[in-house]
Amino acid sequence: MLFPGCRSRALSSLCFCVLVLACVVACQQEGPGGTSSPPPEPASSSWSLVPGKVKEWMEPLVTRTRESWQWFWGPRAFQGFLQTYYDDHLRDLRSHTQAWLQSSKDSLLNKAYNLCPQLLCGDSSWD
């Protein structure tokens, strides 16, 4: 269960993690070109041709998409995104956390005081 008011921070953290993961996957280089796999054996059924056809159709699409989004994966764009994310979400995290802890403490003390019978607690202040 998330704390009240933390849902937007959790969503932004999740989006950030997904973006970093996508960047890492996109930036991985292919293995060395010297090792090539042997040619596939003749297919015994038409269903065994499906993976090759899917790869044949998808490779140009993936290549075009990678080339058109190359500017996004560059270091300047990613660095700008990280700086903006820090400024928007992480810079004042400490003060937000301290304020939340203080309000939680005050709320808990008020609830405890309200549950306490007047004979036991009296009129002393809770600090």
Swiss-Prot record:
Alphabetical list of InterPro entries matching this protein: APOC4
Keywords: Lipid transport, Secreted, Signal, Transport
GO terms (BP aspect): lipid transport; positive regulation of triglyceride storage; triglyceride homeostasis
A GO CC annotation given for this chain: high-density lipoprotein particle
Subcellular location field: Secreted
Top-level lineage group: Eukaryota
Pfam families given in the database record: APOC4
Segment forming the signal sequence: 1-27
Family: Belongs to the apolipoprotein C4 family.
Function: May participate in lipoprotein metabolism.
Name of this protein: Apolipoprotein C-IV
Record organism: Physeter macrocephalus
Lineage of source species: Eukaryota, Metazoa, Chordata, Craniata, Vertebrata
